[in-house]
């Protein structure tokens, strides 16, 4: 017997209607913000945005603070060039596994606890920098401080949770870009802190040690603010509360989530190419001050101030990368996002080569470094205009894997060209290292041509006929999980993701089509004595159905 259609998600519709009164921006069907007003601190969307980038900013400051004071630390601990280079490799190696693990953590307990725990657990390592006595302790402490770079995953996951798919590239890029500024800010801030302590009467060999109490203390402060002010979900509640209430469906067993993320080849390609945008940025953050100090005979304060320019360009460069991604997606869809990434990152590789070729001129070096930083950092932002669409169910795992690719690229590149330990590195200058790093960047960006989404296509080929967003995202769920209603977030995301077809795509979006997994889930539900509508109505967000 047919029933009168009943509107599902009534509370969500009511919330969306009230959004203009409650928030200074509109919300989408998932409660995510359709706009990112960075000057506001509105709960929960904008407060999460600001807490995420501030925590990430501090992780960069602490990780690269030793590189900012490298000439001073090198002389005090009697470190060789190769030892200093290996310590730099250790700093970025720490976060490789940590970023993948953090992806699992945020998928399970939410970004707020993940961010706060990261800051509190690595703060002791920052303080311990004051106690190092030789290369082994110095490298060990840098390794453990570098673990905090997994904050990147919390930052991107949190923003991806709070902002609509049409602006998620911009929001992710702004937050990550402002966080990345810490890599430049530390080159400016740490020499000033060191000099201020030294001018206060503290000997130089002690002053650099005292300087590390500043970022260590700020670690604890930011973790406390995150716990007190942060909120995990657009609903205004934390993950654990939503799971207790049943409002936020569990993602099922952990292994299927990990399998979805690691088993998607697109994740690995983006991890590889991110290693030569963000990885290149990390490498430059590690070596630029020492390069300017030694190559041009500058004092530490001047070398630090000039080196800081590269990282401080993140104030707008990474954000513009995300904006470019969202802008080209409007007419060209996902294919436009991938093309833009390939073009920008290739240009970054070209200017990296040029940077190594102008090593005899300080003015030319600074100008080319600025241009190089623009393309390199825009490419970072462009990556996370694509990453959220690889997997809805395993978004945290994919973000962690791609982020880990950045650290892996930095570790490999620095070990090959800048560590000073291999035989060929004995006669290799840092300028030559920049040239070869640029060549690697150009070559290892080419795999982007192999990324293909069945519903959107690739850089050179179109979509598969009849492919729909619902099919792609629903394949991550089994029939039993669908019958349990665990897939609902993926279905809503699939509907929002139709915007990635681009306005030039002539396919009509039309009504939501029931994917194969959903039909199987309905049969499973019916076989267990339930009603088909318990799957269809809740999943499609449409009106009710009949028996």
Curated annotation (Swiss-Prot):
A GO CC term attached to the entry: transporter complex
Question: Per its UniProt record, what Gene3D superfamilies does this chain match?
Answer: MFS general substrate transporter like domains
Please report a single Pfam family linked to this protein: MFS_1
| Stored InterPro entries | MFS, MFS_trans_sf, NO3_transporter, NO3_transporter_NarK/NarU-like
Tell whether Cell membrane is among the UniProt keywords.
Answer: yes
Ways its activity is controlled:
Nitrite transport mediated by system 1 is very sensitive to inhibition by nitrate.
Instruction: Summarize the record's induction comment.
Output: Up-regulated by nitrate. Up-regulated by nitrite.
Keyword Protein transport attached: no
Q: Which family does it belong to?
A: Belongs to the major facilitator superfamily. Nitrate/nitrite porter (TC 2.A.1.8) family.
Q: What is this protein called?
A: Nitrate transporter 2.1
- Organism this protein belongs to: Chlamydomonas reinhardtii
Q: Which classification does the entry list for the species?
A: Eukaryota, Viridiplantae, Chlorophyta, core chlorophytes, Chlorophyceae
Task: Tell me the gene name.
Answer: NRT2.1
């Amino acid at each position: 017997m047919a029933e009168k259609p009943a509107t599902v998600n009534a509370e969500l519709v009511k919330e969306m209607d009230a959004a203009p009164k409650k928030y200074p921006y509109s919300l989408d069907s998932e409660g995510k913000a359709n706009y990112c007003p960075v000057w506001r601190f509105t709960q929960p969307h904008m407060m999460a945005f600001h807490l995420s980038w501030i925590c990430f900013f501090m992780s960069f400051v602490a990780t690269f603070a030793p590189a900012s004071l490298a000439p001073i630390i090198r002389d005090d601990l009697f470190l060789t060039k190769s030892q200093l280079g290996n310590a730099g490799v250790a700093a970025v190696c720490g976060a490789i596994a940590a970023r993948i693990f953090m992806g699992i953590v945020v998928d399970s307990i939410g970004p707020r606890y993940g961010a706060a725990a990261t800051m509190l657990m690595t703060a002791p390592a920052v303080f311990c920098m004051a106690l190092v006595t030789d290369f082994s302790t110095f490298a060990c402490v840098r390794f453990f401080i570098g673990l905090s770079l997994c904050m990147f995953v919390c930052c991107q996951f949190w923003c991806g949770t709070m902002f609509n798919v049409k602006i998620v590239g911009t929001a992710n890029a702004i937050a990550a870009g402002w966080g990345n500024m810490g890599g430049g800010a530390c080159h400016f801030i740490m020499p000033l802190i060191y000099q201020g302590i030294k001018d206060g009467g503290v000997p130089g060999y002690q002053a650099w040690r005292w300087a590390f109490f500043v970022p260590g203390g700020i670690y604890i402060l930011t973790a406390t603010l995150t716990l007190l002010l942060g909120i995990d979900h657009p609903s205004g509640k934390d993950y654990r509360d939503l799971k207790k209430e049943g409002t936020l469906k569990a993602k099922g067993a952990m292994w299927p989530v990990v399998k979805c993320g690691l088993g998607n080849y697109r994740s690995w390609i983006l991890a590889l190419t991110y290693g030569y945008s963000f990885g290149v940025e990390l490498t430059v953050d590690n070596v630029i001050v020492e390069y300017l100090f030694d190559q041009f005979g500058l004092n530490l304060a001047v070398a630090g101030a000039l080196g800081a320019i590269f990282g401080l360009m993140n104030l707008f460069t990474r954000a513009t990368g995300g904006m470019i991604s969202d802008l080209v997606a409007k007419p060209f869809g996902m294919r436009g996002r991938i093309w833009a990434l390939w073009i920008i990152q290739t240009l970054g590789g070209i200017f990296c080569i040029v940077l190594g070729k102008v090593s005899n001129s300080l003015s030319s070096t600074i100008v080319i470094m600025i241009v190089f930083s623009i393309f390199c950092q825009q490419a970072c932002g462009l990556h996370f205009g694509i990453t959220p669409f690889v997997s809805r169910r395993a978004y945290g795992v994919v973000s962690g894997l791609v982020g880990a690719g950045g650290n892996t690229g930095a570790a490999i590149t620095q070990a090959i060209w800048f560590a000073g330990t291999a035989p060929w590195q004995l006669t290799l200058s840092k300028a030559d290292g920049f040239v070869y790093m640029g060549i690697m960047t150009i070559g290892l960006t080419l795999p982007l041509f192999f990324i293909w989404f069945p519903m959107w296509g690739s850089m050179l080929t179109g979509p598969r006929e009849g492919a729909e967003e619902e099919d792609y995202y629903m394949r991550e769920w089994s029939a039993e999980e669908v019958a349990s209603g665990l897939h609902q977030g993926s279905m809503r995301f699939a509907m929002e993701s139709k915007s990635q077809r681009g306005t030039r795509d002539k396919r009509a979006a039309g009504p939501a089509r029931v994917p194969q997994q959903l039909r199987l889930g309905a049969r499973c539900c019916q076989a267990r004595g339930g009603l088909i509508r318990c799957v269809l109505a809740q999943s499609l967000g449409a009106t009710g159905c009949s028996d």
